[in-house]
Regions:
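Inter-helical junctions in multi-pass inner-membrane proteins, predominant
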Residues: 2-17, 182-187, 213-259, 276-285, ...
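Single transmembrane alpha-helix segments in multi-pass membrane proteins
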Residues: 3-52, 77-92, 210, 253-262, ...
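Alpha-helical transmembrane segments within multi-pass membrane transporters and channels
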Residues: 58-101, 107, 266-271, 275, ...
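Transmembrane helix-bundle core of multi-pass membrane transporters
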Residues: 84-85, 93-185, 212, 277-306, ...
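Hydrophobic alpha-helical transmembrane segments of polytopic membrane proteins
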Residues: 20, 70-72, 247-272, 309-319, ...
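Membrane-embedded helix boundary and interhelical linker motif in transport proteins
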Residues: 9, 31-76, 80, 144-148, ...
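Helix-loop-helix "hairpin" substructures at the membrane interface of multi-pass membrane proteins
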Residues: 14-15, 153-238, 261-266
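Hydrophobic alpha-helical transmembrane segments
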Residues: 41-45, 60-68, 94-96, 166-170, ...
Length: 330
């Protein structure tokens, strides 16, 4: 029971981080029709910017300033480069953003090197947020923070939940709530939603679509950078983090339905829970079946966890190519 609860919380926190990262890409595509190939590179850039700012200023200011600076850089890129390429079609946009991803990767390696940097959350987030004490009779007791050694010794099992995981989920949730409020409750959000379906009408009413595109692209890159600060301090900050998380983001976007924010949320939760439960309940898949070679009989769910999102992607492309909430092509 405790293991299932911890796997659920880990899956939700990881899923919220994935959604925070994929939400920016989804909003940019739904409004501008741009599939930003460099989106994960802004995630990496946010992690390194947070690392650089955390040393002199502290983690809290870095958590705020790094997304703002990266979002400003994304807005400048949209204004100076992407806006000129946008009328040429999707292929030039993909090539330009792909080139940007290479430039950002080389820039990060030039400044910070290829090895991981020591970017960690503050001391307050390095311990346990709470501890689940599982009794021999199956009962559960939750203790705030790290449980005392005597309490762990008296319990059948002791399961701490990391504070940085709780912070990751809570911060992602707050940022996404702010994004929802902006899109659903403000005049700017009304203009953005109207521009998704009726851009010519929005322009005819006197709104500057170029300024809307600038703001949306900057917001999308800022969300990616915020996810980078959180994810980089929780997992690892290294140049390859963009490549490792970038494929996962595109899996989320395609499974949820390209351009669908609700679909990206459901897909993020699905993939986060699928991976964490596979690792948490590590069981041999083929053990005991007749005729199975010993090498295959040792395969476990944890070994297949990195592959499971891509299996979901393949099944989705076969059974429902438009994704969970996407619209079928006419």
């Amino acid at each position: 029971m405790a293991l299932a609860l911890l796997s659920l919380l880990n899956g939700l926190s990881y899923g919220l981080l994935l959604f925070l990262l994929s939400a920016g890409l989804t909003v940019v595509f739904s409004l501008m029709g741009v599939l930003n190939f460099a989106h994960a590179s802004f995630y990496m850039l946010g992690a390194y910017a947070g690392y650089a700012l955390a040393e002199p200023l502290g983690f809290g200011p870095a958590l705020v300033l790094a997304p703002l600076l990266v979002g400003l850089a994304g807005a400048l890129f949209e204004h100076a480069v992407l806006r000129r390429v946008h009328p040429m079609g999707h292929v030039p946009e993909l090539l330009v953003t792909f080139g940007l991803s290479i430039v950002l990767l080389e820039l990060v390696q030039l400044v910070w090197g290829r090895a991981p940097v020591d970017f960690r959350a503050p001391q307050a987030l390095r311990g346990a947020a709470f501890t689940l004490l599982e009794q021999a009779d199956g009962g559960l007791t939750a203790v705030a923070g790290a449980a005392a050694a005597a309490d762990c010794a008296a319990a059948a099992r002791c399961h701490p939940f990391p504070a940085n995981r709780l912070f990751m989920g809570a911060t992602s949730l707050l940022a996404l709530a702010g994004l929802w409020l902006m899109l659903a409750r403000t005049r700017l959000g009304l203009v953005i939603r109207a521009a998704q379906t009726h851009p010519q009408m929005v322009r005819a009413l006197g709104h500057d679509l170029g300024r809307v595109f600038l703001l949306v692209f900057g917001t999308g890159t800022a969300l990616a950078a915020l996810a980078g600060v959180i994810g980089g301090s929780t997992f690892v900050t290294e140049p390859s983090m963009a490549a490792s998380v970038g494929t996962m983001v595109f899996v989320v976007v395609v499974v949820g339905g390209v351009g669908s924010l609700g679909g990206a949320f459901v897909a993020s939760m699905l993939i986060g829970l699928l991976q964490t439960f596979a690792v948490g309940f590590d069981q041999p898949l083929l053990q005991g079946l007749p005729g199975v070679p010993p090498a295959l009989a040792r395969w476990s769910l944890a070994q297949l966890a990195p592959v499971l999102p891509y299996l979901v992607l393949v099944l989705m492309l076969v059974l429902r190519p438009q994704g969970l909430f996407g619209r079928p092509s006419p």
